[in-house]
Swiss-Prot record:
This is Phosphoserine aminotransferase. Its main location: cytoplasm. NCBIfam families: PRK05355.1, serC_1. Homodimer. It is found in: Cytoplasm. Keywords: Amino-acid biosynthesis, Aminotransferase, Cytoplasm, Pyridoxal phosphate, Pyridoxine biosynthesis, Serine biosynthesis, Transferase. Catalyzes the reversible conversion of 3-phosphohydroxypyruvate to phosphoserine and of 3-hydroxy-2-oxo-4-phosphonooxybutanoate to phosphohydroxythreonine. Belongs to the class-V pyridoxal-phosphate-dependent aminotransferase family. SerC subfamily. Its EC number is 2.6.1.52.
Length: 362
């Protein structure tokens, strides 16, 4: 079978080594004669899996001891609802930084529970998209927290600054598409959350990292499954968790440590992104419409100067083993998502195909 590279924005490709190991263990996990999918989440064997996954994640991100790590259901959209219900307390507003589609979705969901102060930081100059730096964010004095998304997958925009708004600001960040791609100073945040299906593991599990002092503030009518305090007390097993996704996520954490940790992964990711952006910028057929300082390392959207070639480009790319390059319906064009599991060789194969396609169609 020819090599296939999956550029999907999510669910995204998983490390080949992880998939091979999962295949080997699928029907007889640890000599039990059964799959890890079939054992009780309360068995000593699975509790060990869960504990090791948390330990490895803590090691990778250097998570301080005063933070709890949860493995939840519901994806990032579930957290859009959980956050205000857990953290508003007696306040009626929160700052929502809107930099793209997903942060706007979070703000819209928050409207069910409060009157969010929406701060739109998007800018467009001559067709080039950028986002305002943090020192230009007009934060309110009475907000329960500040919510933002460091990486917008659809627009391909990124915020590389880490927050420094003072100790009185509780910062919440949706790291779904960029977690584990580079080191993070977790201590700058009150809550970090991330859907698994991009850089953590398969769809079905969501990581929530929450500072201990933020627990115990949930609204009295919050569904128990969304209550962080309930989940902490239950070790993320208030109900049956997505055990296979948890197991595979733990294997990805182990793989990341084996690669040299997040410093090494960050170097690889930068090299992949630089290769692809250089190919786009040096071409006459492809264009990326994001300002240099805000270009995402994880998600690279690009358009063909002649949109009539979009279908042909995507069809031929697929035939060459370059899959899932179609841009989001909101943005159109093409998009290459180059998360941790995407190899440099995969990006090189895409760049070589793009050059060949331009020679034949430019």
């Amino acid at each position: 079978m020819n090599q296939v590279y999956n550029f999907s924005a999510g669910p995204a490709m998983l490390p080949a080594e992880v998939l091979r190991r999962a295949e080997q263990e699928l029907c007889n996990w640890h000599g039990l004669g059964t799959s890890v999918m079939e054992i009780s989440h309360r068995s000593k064997e699975f509790i060990a899996v869960a504990a090791e996954a948390e330990k490895d994640l803590r090691d990778l991100l250097a998570i301080p001891e005063n933070y709890n790590v949860l493995f939840c259901h519901g994806g990032a959209r579930g957290q859009f609802s959980a956050l205000p219900q857990n953290l508003l307390g007696d306040k009626s507003t929160a700052d929502y930084i809107v930099s793209g589609y997903w942060s706007e979705c979070a703000a819209k969901e928050a409207e069910k529970y409060c009157t969010p102060n929406i701060i739109d930081i998007r800018s467009n100059t001559d067709g080039i998209t950028s986002v305002k730096p943090m020192n230009e964010w007009a934060l309110s004095s009475d907000a329960a927290y500040v919510h933002y998304c460091p990486n917008e997958t659809i627009e391909g925009t990124a915020i590389f600054e880490e927050p420094d708004f003072g100790d009185d600001k509780i910062v919440i960040a949706d790291y779904s598409s960029t977690i584990l791609s580079a080191p993070i100073d977790v201590s700058r945040y009150g809550v970090i959350y991330a859907g698994a299906q991009k850089n953590i593991g398969p769809a079905g599990i969501t990581v929530v990292i929450i500072r201990e002092d933020l627990l115990g503030k949930a609204h009295k009518h919050i569904p128990s499954i969304l209550d962080y305090t309930v989940q902490v007390k239950a070790d993320s097993m208030y109900n049956t968790p997505p055990t296979f996704a948890w197991y595979l996520s733990g294997m990805v954490f182990k793989w990341l440590k084996e690669q040299g940790g997040l410093q090494e992964i960050s170097k690889r990711n930068l090299a992949k992104a630089e290769l692809l952006y250089r190919a786009i910028d040096n071409s006459n057929l492809y264009i990326n419409r994001v300002a240099l300082q805000n270009r995402s390392i994880m998600n690279v959207p690009f358009q063909l100067v002649n949109p009539a070639l979009d279908g042909k480009f995507l069809e031929e790319a697929y035939a060459h083993g370059l899959h899932a390059l179609k841009g989001h319906k909101v943005a159109g064009g093409a998009r290459a998502s180059i998360y941790n599991a995407m190899s440099y060789e995969g990006v090189k194969a895409l760049v070589e195909f793009m050059a060949d396609f331009e020679r034949r169609n430019g």
